[in-house]
């Protein structure tokens, strides 16, 4: 397919490369800065542009891999006057109807993964969740997703919002906890790498056990002495201390749900 890629961030970088490897024609890469547009265009093909007025109007598909907050501003400028094209955004929490009244054929292709530009990922194994407003959009978006991923699922906007919420807990919040652990260790001169086997095993366990079955630690047992002592170690950081206590309470309450089932 002939594609124009709008955006040059982490997701756009990996998606652009995957589309190129799948045999698609990346005609242009748009970004607000020429540096970003050129960097991705070098890797994914196509011409870099920084002016929306310079975006070609003969592509089959326009993929908007940009910040969620940019879409309402970007869509009206880009979609008008191209009734034959399919417009796609890649956001987890933005409904498909953000295109309504602006484009004729539109939908969503949401790859659920955490992306960093310089870290390679196997796009074939990334779950991609798709939605289209009509038969043409559904077929184009599904075919596009299947060309880069072996795991493609149809999903409504409402379900995708919940999926993205779950992903925030499973990925973003978890990584923030790694950051907190890193800070605690750094103050004691302990390298973060000592945590890696623990982190790896924690992630590996949920391939075989449910998260609730895999839960361990003082909060599960509600060992009040340890919880109190560890909470006191955080007395100089009220936000971190509050987070520790709330997570401990949540873990204990979830464990009681398990006991009742």
Model-derived regions: residue spans:
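Short active-site oxyanion
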Residues: 1, 24-28, 58-62, 82-87, ...
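Hydrophobic Val/Ile/Leu positions in short beta-strands of Rossmann-like dinucleotide-binding domains
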Residues: 5-6, 64, 130
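Short phosphate-binding/catalytic loops that engage adenosine nucleotides
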Residues: 24-25, 104, 150, 190
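Short, hydrophobic beta-strand segments that form beta-sheet elements in well-ordered domains
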Residues: 27-31, 86-91, 109, 128-130, ...
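Rossmann-like NAD(P)(H) cofactor-binding subdomain of soluble oxidoreductases
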Residues: 34, 38, 42-120
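Internal alpha-helical scaffold of NAD(P)-dependent oxidoreductase catalytic cores
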Residues: 36, 40-43, 120-165, 170-207, ...
């Amino acid at each position: 397919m002939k594609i124009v890629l709008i955006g040059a961030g982490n997701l756009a970088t990996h998606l652009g490369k995957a589309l190129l490897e799948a045999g698609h024609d990346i005609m242009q890469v748009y970004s607000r800065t020429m540096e970003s547009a050129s960097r991705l265009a070098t890797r994914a093909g196509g011409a870099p542009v920084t002016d929306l007025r310079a975006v070609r109007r003969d592509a089959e598909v326009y993929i908007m891999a940009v910040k969620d907050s940019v879409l309402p501003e970007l869509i009206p400028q880009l979609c008008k006057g191209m009734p034959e094209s399919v417009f796609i955004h890649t956001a987890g929490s933005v409904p498909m109807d953000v295109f309504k009244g602006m484009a004729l054929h539109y939908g969503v292709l949401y790859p659920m993964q955490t992306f960093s530009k310089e870290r390679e990922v196997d796009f074939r194994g990334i779950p991609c969740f798709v939605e289209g407003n009509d038969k043409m959009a559904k077929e184009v978006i599904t075919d596009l997703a299947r060309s880069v991923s072996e795991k493609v699922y149809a999903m409504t906007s409402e379900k995708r919002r919940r999926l993205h919420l779950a992903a925030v807990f499973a990925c973003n919040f978890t990584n923030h906890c790694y950051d907190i652990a890193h800070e605690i260790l750094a103050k004691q001169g302990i390298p973060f790498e000592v945590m890696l086997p623990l982190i790896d095993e924690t992630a590996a366990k949920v391939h075989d056990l449910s998260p609730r079955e895999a839960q361990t630690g003082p909060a599960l047992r509600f060992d009040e002495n340890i919880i109190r002592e560890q909470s006191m170690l955080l007395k100089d950081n009220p936000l971190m201390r509050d987070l520790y206590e709330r997570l401990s309470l949540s873990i204990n309450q979830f464990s009681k749900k398990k006991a009742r089932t």
